[in-house]
């Protein structure tokens, strides 16, 4: 599996610290029955911990190279890896209007747009 290089034009900075990824995933567990949407999974470092729990996880990634990598790394998650631009998504359609937890190692370039 060929690693993906971060693309500066997308503001990518991949999470590589496994302990930080585990801590983020553990923080999401405060809402164990609510599905999770991960923004910008990159190479799936956080994703690998999110999918350990018995809950629905979806990941949205704009970079087609990262999407292909994620398909290979997480074949069972393939239908839940969304190759889209998060900022243009209709979030009501992601989980059919249900409440969900938003997490991720957000691309710096869009972090303010995500939260505001």
Protein language model regions, located:
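Catalytic cores of RNA-modifying enzymes
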Residues: 1-116
């Amino acid at each position: 599996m060929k690693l993906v290089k971060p693309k500066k034009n997308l503001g990518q900075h991949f999470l590589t610290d496994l302990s930080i990824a585990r801590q983020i995933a553990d923080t999401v567990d405060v809402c164990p029955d609510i599905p999770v949407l991960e923004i910008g999974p990159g190479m799936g470092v956080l994703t690998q911990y999110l999918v350990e729990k018995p809950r629905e996880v979806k990941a949205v990634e704009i970079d087609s190279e990262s999407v292909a990598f994620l398909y290979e790394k997480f074949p069972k998650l393939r239908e839940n890896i969304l190759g889209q631009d998060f900022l243009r998504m209709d979030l009501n359609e992601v989980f059919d209007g249900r409440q969900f937890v938003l997490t991720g190692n957000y691309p710096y370039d869009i972090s303010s747009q995500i939260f505001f």
